[in-house]
Amino acid sequence: VSAFLLNRSSDLEILVKLDLLKSLGATYVACFVDGQLQGTFAQAGMKLPLNMKEISPDGPNRPQTPKGPFPYITEEMTFTNTKAGATLAGTLTVHKGGAKCVMIMVTGSGPENRDEEIYAHKPFAVIADRLARAGIATLRYDDRATGQSVGGDMKNATSIDLAEDAAAGIEWLRAQKRFKKVGLLGHSEGGLIAFMLGAQKKVDFIVSLAGPAVKGDSILLYQSRNSGSPLAKGITMEYLRNMMKGNKWVEWFMDYDPTENIAKTKCPVLALNGTKDCQVPAAQNILVLRRLLAKNKKTVIKECEGLNHLFQHCNTGRPDEYYNIEETIAEEVLADIVGWVNKL
């Protein structure tokens, strides 16, 4: 932990940048109170309350993290987005018996590694493991300028730029001529990107996990008002926009309306949203998806009862629970993905 002293009050306030949060590009401002840190987690313009206490040096228990022996092969590879000057490093996971289809996996907002790692959870590694065991291949990769990926401007990149990275990965997969179908699994912002590429007919099918279906300013206003702070309920759209000025990604996201690209998407879609998601509200987004994809064949849209933004079983759904939950991703979600893809 690296800490920077902000003042010398009796409640020492510090700015903490944790190793666990490096991949998120997030910060944490807190005070020491009764032996623990009580503060605010901030990422990509979103601010949420988060309390933290010292943990065992052995780290948290994550029982779903894949452990060998594995019935599949992992291949380290790279592909290039020439326009952005980015070389993306990733892992191709394929069952030893081969696979007919493959999914490229696209992470949520902020710089993230190929496992979409957060608080020692590795959801993309868990998903890739489960899919490979079911004969479904995956390609997951570090975001541009993150992990082993080099080049490209991540700080000022919008979802349009990151969609071009994903498109380069799709082109690489098709060039391998190993798979009959190439799909895209996107989480959160990755779901947004999935529909961008779906509208361009770049993929054969889409799995959207907590992907937004409404304009970005509505999403951020919901997040802010449901952050748990007593003052948050009174936040207005005007205040939010003024607060976010200067953050290129947030300004772009607030103005972006995904409905046009969703309506243009004609490939099969599996869209899952957790009912306790405090970042992308299920009811609001599911309603829009059902309307826009009503005529889309082989599409399944589902609210996952009791699950948060990471698709963990939870109490409140707020991000301050993520660390303490041992489950990385609900088993029923993994089963839904495998079952749906295998029926295509």
Language-model features: locations:
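Short beta-strand/loop motif that positions the catalytic acidic residue
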Residues: 265, 271-273, 277
